[in-house]
Structures are given as structure tokens and as C-alpha cells.
């Protein structure tokens, strides 16, 4: 049975968006789609963070969702956090149209992202290849521009 989730991204600045998640069945890939506006042109890190706690903005969402204690990586890497979805690209108009298919995240079970926080970052994620310690944790993606808790949708 298909499962769906949604996330409304908001931050302190102009960045906002709505992201949809759909998984046809357990074990199938999750299709991530939506739009984020108010970004600067270029690539922005896009990750699922550990907690669904936005009580103090995006900072209380904790680190990337990483149940297997792996190093940060890109979406196609074997060594990656479950929440590592790479980058979204914004055009000159500041709009990023999101279209990602990921086989590691899930909407149920051990890798479920339901109740966790989706975050879009200030800078490009270097996918763990930046050559420093921060790269292996966050991809040097910088501050958290907007976030929202991922919830079950109909």
C-alpha cells in the first residue's frame, strides 16, 4: 500500500517550500518532490535531520538522521547517513524544483523519516568529499535556512 508524507519548510528568512514524499510499498524507493522558494542561486544541502523538534527553529532538529553511525556522504554513496539527500539546485529566480528518488530513506520501519525534520541549507553539500572533519559530518553545507517536520499525508 502506498504511503505518503508532506513537509512544510519555513525559516527565519524568505526561504519556504512544500515537499511531498511517496513510497509505493515498503522496500520501494521514496519519491521526493516539491518546490522551495527564496533561495540564492546554486546548490543547497538537503537533509533529513534526527529529530522532529523545531521548538528553537531548525537548530533543535539535531544532526543528520544517521542510525548506523556512518560518515556523511552523497545519496549514491554506500557510506552515507540515511538522511543524506544531497543538494537541491535553485535557479536565478531562487526557486528549486525538487525531484529525488531515494532507496535508503523510507516512510516506515527502521529508516522511517516520519516525525523527523527536513532541512534545506545555506551552502552546497560537498557530499563528504571536502577533505576535513566537518565534511564527514555535515558536508560543509552551512546554516539551516528552512525546515519542517515530516508528517503523514493522505
Curated annotation (Swiss-Prot):
Modified residues (Phosphoserine): 99, 106, 108
Tissue spec: Expressed in lungs.
Keyword flag Disulfide bond: yes
Description of post-translational modifications: Palmitoylation helps nuclear targeting and decreases catalytic activity.
Top-level taxon of the source organism: Eukaryota
Record-given protein name: Superoxide dismutase [Cu-Zn]
Keywords, in A-Z order: Acetylation, Antioxidant, Copper, Cytoplasm, Disulfide bond, Lipoprotein, Metal-binding, Nucleus, Oxidoreductase, Palmitate, Phosphoprotein, Zinc
Family, per entry: Belongs to the Cu-Zn superoxide dismutase family.
Enzyme Commission (EC) number: 1.15.1.1
Gene that this polypeptide is encoded by: Sod1
Positions of Cu cation binding: 47, 49, 64, 121
Modified residues annotated as N6-succinyllysine in this record: 4, 10, 92, 123, 137
Subunit comment: Homodimer; non-disulfide-linked. Heterodimer with SOD1. The heterodimer CCS:SOD1 interacts with SLC31A1; this heterotrimer is Cu(1+)-mediated and its maintenance is regulated through SOD1 activation.
Enzyme class: oxidoreductase
Lipid-attached positions, S-palmitoyl cysteine: 7
A family per Pfam: Sod_Cu
Annotated localization: Cytoplasm; Nucleus
Cofactor: binding comment: Binds 1 copper ion per subunit. Binds 1 zinc ion per subunit.
Binding site for Zn(2+): 64, 72, 81, 84
Cofactor(s) the protein needs: Cu cation; Zn(2+)
Sites bearing N6-acetyllysine, chain numbering: 123, 137
Modified residues (N-acetylalanine): 2
Induction: Expression is induced by hypoxia.
Matching InterPro entries: SOD-like_Cu/Zn_dom_sf (IPR036423), SOD_Cu/Zn_/chaperone (IPR024134), SOD_Cu/Zn_BS (IPR018152), SOD_Cu_Zn_dom (IPR001424)
Role description: Destroys radicals which are normally produced within the cells and which are toxic to biological systems.
Amino acid at each position: 500500500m502506498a504511503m505518503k508524507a508532506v513537509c512544510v519548510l519555513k525559516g527565519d528568512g524568505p526561504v519556504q517550500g512544500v515537499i511531498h514524499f511517496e513510497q509505493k510499498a515498503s522496500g520501494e524507493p521514496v519519491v521526493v518532490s516539491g518546490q522551495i522558494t527564496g533561495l540564492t542561486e546554486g546548490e543547497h544541502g538537503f537533509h533529513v535531520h534526527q529529530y522532529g523538534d523545531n521548538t528553537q527553529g531548525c537548530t533543535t532538529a539535531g544532526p543528520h538522521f544517521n542510525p548506523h553511525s556512518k560518515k556523511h556522504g552523497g545519496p549514491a554513496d554506500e557510506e552515507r547517513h540515511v538522511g543524506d539527500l544531497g543538494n537541491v539546485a535553485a535557479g536565478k529566480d531562487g526557486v528549486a524544483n525538487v525531484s529525488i528518488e531515494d532507496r535508503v530513506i523510507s516512510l516506515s520501519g527502521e529508516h522511517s523519516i516520519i516525525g523527523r525534520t527536513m532541512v534545506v541549507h545555506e551552502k552546497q553539500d560537498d557530499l563528504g568529499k571536502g577533505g576535513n572533519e566537518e565534511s564527514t559530518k555535515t558536508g560543509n553545507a552551512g546554516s539551516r535556512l528552512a525546515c519542517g517536520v515530516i508528517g503523514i499525508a493522505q
